[in-house]
Amino acid sequence: MKGVLLVNLGSPKSPTPKDLKPYLEEFLMDERVIDFPKWLRTILVKGIILKTRPRRSAKAYKKIWWKEGSPLIVLSKKLRSIIEENSSIPISLSMRYGNPSIFEGLKELNEKGINEIFIVPLYPQFAMATTETINVLAEKIRKESFSHMKFTTLQPFYNNVDYIKAVSYTHLRAHETPLH
């Protein structure tokens, strides 16, 4: 049976230094985000960045945080709901960093009897720090916990004509700019 795993970047649980610290640590310790040897990345992230960044980032997150929670999580859940309403295929939502995790998303699909997973990174472009890290972690989890599953990943679509038209249309509608 087939299912879809939507994957976005992620967000801390709340806009507080306490919740930002583990989120930033998970994110910045990813070798595909900071491409340094592990020893140097550890010194940089744990020895320098995590001592000050959570407090500074919390102030920025508080400015954009919605009463419903993280805008990224809220909008990702809304996207999942819209897709579910218009599809008969089981959909699960996960985040590369934070929760719901990729493991949780795969577990949800597994519990529904899904064994063919179409992974949809919610980024149009390919980058080591986005799409690649999703694929690497998903494959690691598959090998460790869901070896019966088969994965296919949506290829980058930044140059897809329909995607460009949709983004253009959304922009024009939002700004009420007429097409010329």
Label each residue range with its predicted role.
Residues S92-K165:
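Long, hydrophobic, well-ordered secondary-structure blocks that form the structural core
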Residues T16, P71-L72, R96-S101, E108, ...:
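Secondary-structure junction/capping motif
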Residues S11-K13, P124, L179:
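Active-site micro-motifs of SAM-dependent methyltransferase domains
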Residues K2-L93:
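N-terminal glycine-rich anion-binding loop in soluble enzyme alpha/beta folds
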